[in-house]
Amino acid sequence: MTRKQRRMTIIGGSLAVLALAAALVLNALRDSIVFFSTPTMVAEKHVQAGKRFRLGGLVQPGSLQRGDNLAVSFEVADGNAKLPVAYKGILPDLFREGQGVVAEGALDANGVFKADTVLAKHDETYMPKDVADALKKQGHWKDDYGGKASDGVKPAATTAQGNPQGAVR
């Protein structure tokens, strides 16, 4: 075997081993790569009780029930299916019926998703309540904040420190 053939054999073997390792890692992480599963995906996969995963969807309007000691139950829906969720803890400020939510936990034997973490989702038009209140108080609030400005006015430029240019301190 010449030096070139030996070198090509080593490179080919190394690439084969690397491809096999990548395939094994991706296979092991297959279910973890998805950020969350929807109620429809959970129903189709027939998820085993006790297996941890993230559940995402919209909080079904009218399904929120508060119990004793911070216990909360609600349904997460995706348009096709809905899944009951039980959670014990303080809900995020953005949590509301009809809003997006991602819950982390596992299904119990009765098909109820027992969440130990609940995250409220918001869209790109979200503005923290404190900021919105401050803008309203100062008289700078516009109903279209968070969306595109209807009057064609662009937002003020900011400096590297994140302060508006020309801002009075």
UniProtKB/Swiss-Prot annotation:
Subcellular localization, as worded in the UniProt entry: Cell inner membrane
InterPro entries recorded: CcmE (IPR004329), CcmE-like_sf (IPR036127), NA-bd_OB-fold (IPR012340)
SUPFAM superfamilies for the chain: Heme chaperone CcmE
Signal peptide region: none
Bilayer-crossing regions: 8-28
Compositional bias of kind Polar residues: 158-169
Record keywords, A-Z: Cell inner membrane, Cell membrane, Cytochrome c-type biogenesis, Heme, Iron, Membrane, Metal-binding, Signal-anchor, Transmembrane, Transmembrane helix
Residue ranges of the region described as Disordered: 143-169
Protein family: Belongs to the CcmE/CycJ family.
Protein name (Swiss-Prot/TrEMBL): Cytochrome c-type biogenesis protein CcmE
Organism: Bradyrhizobium diazoefficiens (strain JCM 10833 / BCRC 13528 / IAM 13628 / NBRC 14792 / USDA 110)
Taxonomic lineage: Bacteria, Pseudomonadati, Pseudomonadota, Alphaproteobacteria, Hyphomicrobiales
